[in-house]
Amino acid sequence: MANSTTTAVIAAANGNGTAIEVIASPLTRAEYVRRGRILGENTERLGAEQAGFLVSSQSHFEMAGGEFCGNASRAAAVMFSKLRGADNVEFTVSGFKGLVSATVDRRSDNEYYVRCRFLGMSVGVYPVEGHEQTINIVDLGGIVHVVVESRFPAQAEIYRETHHHLTEELSLRERDAVGVVWIERKDDSVAIHPVVWVRSIDTFFYESSCGSGTIAACAVTGVSDIIQPTGKIIRAEVDGDFVTLESDMEVIHD
C-alpha cells in the first residue's frame, strides 16, 4: 500500500504547531529524519515548530527526530480521532514505551480540547548543584528538560548560549532532545519559556507552547496549570503511575 501525503498542522494552546503527515506504513529512522526535515521546512510558514508522521497501519505516531513530544501527541490524537470517527483513541508515540489514551472533545470544525494519559511514564527529577538559580533536570526518557527558575533572557543569543552551555555541562549532548525551560512564578501561577533542541534533525526553537516542558514544570513546582508563552494554559498532572496533559488544540492547516 503506498504511503499517502495527507498533511495537517495542529497548534496547542495557540502555538507550537505540529506538522503531521499521514503515512500507511513505517519508514526507516533515516527516512523519518530526511522527510521530517523537509516537512518541517515546508510548514514552518504555517506555524509548525516540529514535524512527525502518523503511521495509520500501526496506530503509531513518530516524531521526525524520534523524540517524545507532548503537544505532538495531542495533535496526533486529533488526527487519530478524525480518521477513526471516535472521541476516545489509543496509540503509541516515539520516545515513550507505553500506550497513550486520549479523549478528544470537538468544540468546532477546527477546535478541540484534548486530554492525553501516558500510563507508566517515568518522570525523574534531579537537582543540579552549584548554580545561583534553582535548577533541576527532569528526565522523561524521550526528552530531557533542564528547568531553570529565573527570569527568561529574551535575547536569542543569550538563551541559545545558555542552552548550549547547560547541555554541555550536564552531558546531555547525546540525548534525542534537550529543552531548557525557564520558569517564572507569579503569585500562585507558573509561566514557562521553553527552548528545545532536537539532535538528529538539529532544530532549535523557542517554542510558543510546550507539552513536555509543562510536565517538567509541574513535576518541579507541583503546579498543574502552566502558562505558555502564548499566554494560554496547558494543564499537567504528574502521578506515580501516569502523566496527563490537556489543553485546547486547533487545526490551523489541512
Where are the predicted features?
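A glycine-rich beta-to-alpha transition motif near the start of alpha/beta enzyme domains, typified by
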Residues: 1-113, 122-130, 146-254
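Short, cationic low-complexity segments
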Residues: 132-144
